[in-house]
Amino acid sequence: MEYLNYSAVVIGSGISGQYAAIKLSEKLDNAKILLVTKSGLGESNSRYAQGGIVGVMEENKSDSVASHISDTLNAGAGLCDFNTVRYISEKSNEVIHDLMHEGVEFDKDENGQLLFTLEGAHSVRRIMHCNGDATGRGIEKRLTKISSSSNNIEVLENTIAVELLCRDRECLGCILFDGKNYQIALSHVVILAAGGIGQLYKNTTNPVCATGDGIALAYSAGAELRDLEFVQFHPTALAVDGANKNFLISEAVRGEGAKLVNEKGVPFMKKYHELEDLAPRDVVSRANFEEMKLAGKDYVYLDATKLGVEKIEKHFPTISLMCKNNGINMAQDFIPVHPAAHYFMGGVKANIDGRTSVKGLYVIGENASTGLQGANRLASNSLLECVVTAYSLADYVKEHQNNEVIEADEFIKNKLKKYYQELGFIEYDTDALKTELQNIMWNGAGIIRNEQGLKQAENELVNLKSKFLRKDVCANIQEYEFKNMLTVSQLIVASALKRKESRGAHYREDFPNTKDVSEHNCMLKEQGELSFVR
């Protein structure tokens, strides 16, 4: 077997992963970057991000760093890290201009000036878009073109990372699996940019690859995790059956004036929050959930008819087309919507340059907890966090570059041996197992939680785990995904049980009030067991 050394190994090919790979390939001496993706290059949560990217831009005279900090802290409900928020806000102008230098094209007006839009809980227009409502796809398409043509970036598609190689709390590489064969990639810089956890829930706006792999890998490696109870449910996913189920109806539609209404066409958000339809997402999701219960239906409606045909076609071409494909005319018809798991505020505890509690292990993007998002992410802050942390990571690694070759000693070689043992003849229906897990999480650890529901979810997950006998080694990529989903689900439920209050996206109907003092839930794996730490 060949044991190859790399300047950096990046696991995940969304915006944070690809941007980190590109910046590292540009900044490191004799760069040799390995970019690993579980599906095809560019298939990620980032690709489906419609709303846009936040930036406090020098071109936008009505905005300021102070204003963006204030909005982010208000949405974060006491759990944001002020220094992280300030750094990312201050850095946004530089990094977004670098994206533009790399060839990303943001929407502009007829005078060639950047267009800024408004979204929920933002006090000013500061969100930028690519092609109206295809921002994630626009950014990722350009980054994919760069990374796939770079001589310094090797891309491995349809390959999953199954274990991080750690010794004495230092990460030295990872074990990869392409569905048939295993291989080891060695590096002093291993970057997890593996995305979110949406597939843990029955309803989600996330693609099928969002199975919490990065968080499960980091947990198994002993890295500290933080605030895993905070799952953001987007209020407006398209409530239709079939291939378009849970397609995201961007918050930007409400930012331009659309209203949530009941089946009689009556707006209802005024009775839930002073900001009405532009209230923080947790508030709007719970409001939708309550209205659905009142009406005895699985959806409410979004009324975008007052926006008019011209604005709809200009700003929301993707959403408009998706609605038309489902027999809905946005300019004339109400859109059936319901909440769906959308974004994970929790994750691996990391600095703004991706460093974690394990030397050599870096985490960026949605699987990281940097302190920007707090208990409830501000709309469109996620793509900003992806690019700023990737950019800062590349700067840090350049400054501390270690070119020493990692030798494949007996410790490393022995790590691989277990993966070639016979597994026996057990075959698992992973689709059925995933569906069972998704229902458990939706019912017990979803939008509105309580002790009884969480305890029931905890017990049901233990029972589900007893049906799945794989421990370290699995037969295929789908089994590895399910193993990761099970691990992260149990961690989320444990963290949700520990937080006996309601804060941000975590709502406990048995503890509806927010404590005066905000505290993080931090956890790690010690002696093979979950341990909460301060």
Predicted regions, residues:
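N-terminal Rossmann-fold NAD(P) dinucleotide-binding loop
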Residues: G17
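Short hydrophobic core segments
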Residues: V9-I11, A185-A194
